[in-house]
C-alpha cells in the first residue's frame, strides 16, 4: 500500500515538529507545497517540492499513474481535510493509467489526523510495486 499526500499550509507541519517554523513561513510565502509519503519504516518523508497547489495535485496524480500496479483491479483511496473540491479534481483528472481503475473512495480525514496535517490536505492511497516510489528525487 502506497500513500502520498500534500498539505495546504506548512504551519501545521511546523506545529507538530515535522518542519521548522522558519521553513514553514518561507515555504508559505513562496507557495511551496511538499509531496509527502510514508516510507517502509513508517515515517513521513518528503518526496518532492512543488510550487503551487495545482502543481502539487498534478504531481500526486502523476505519482499514482507511474506507480500503480494492475489499475483495473484497484480502487484508489482519497482522503482530504476540508478539500472536497480538490479531491474531486484528482478523481476527474484521469490520465490513461487511472482511467482504468475500478473506482475511487473519497472520504474526509478524522479530526485527530486532520489536526496534525491541517486543512486543505489531500492524500491518495493505492497498491503499488513498492513503497520506494519511482522517480524519487
Report the location of each language-model feature.
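Mixed-charge interfacial surface used for oligomerization/domain docking
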Residues: 1-137
Amino acid at each position: 500500500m502506497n500513500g502520498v499526500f500534500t498539505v495546504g499550509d506548512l504551519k501545521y507541519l511546523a506545529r507538530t515538529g515535522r518542519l521548522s517554523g522558519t521553513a514553514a513561513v518561507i515555504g508559505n510565502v513562496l507557495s511551496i507545497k511538499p509531496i509527502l509519503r510514508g516510507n517502509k519504516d513508517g515515517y513521513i518523508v518528503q518526496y518532492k517540492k512543488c510550487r503551487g497547489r495545482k502543481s502539487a495535485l498534478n504531481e500526486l496524480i502523476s505519482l499514482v499513474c507511474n506507480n500503480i500496479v494492475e489499475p483495473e483491479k484497484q480502487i484508489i483511496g482519497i482522503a482530504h481535510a476540508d478539500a472536497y473540491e480538490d479531491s474531486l479534481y484528482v478523481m476527474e483528472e484521469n490520465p490513461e493509467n487511472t482511467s482504468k481503475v475500478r473506482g475511487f473512495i473519497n472520504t474526509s480525514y478524522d479530526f485527530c489526523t486532520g489536526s496534525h496535517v491541517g486543512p486543505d490536505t489531500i492524500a491518495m492511497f493505492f497498491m503499488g510495486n513498492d513503497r520506494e516510489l519511482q522517480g524519487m528525487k
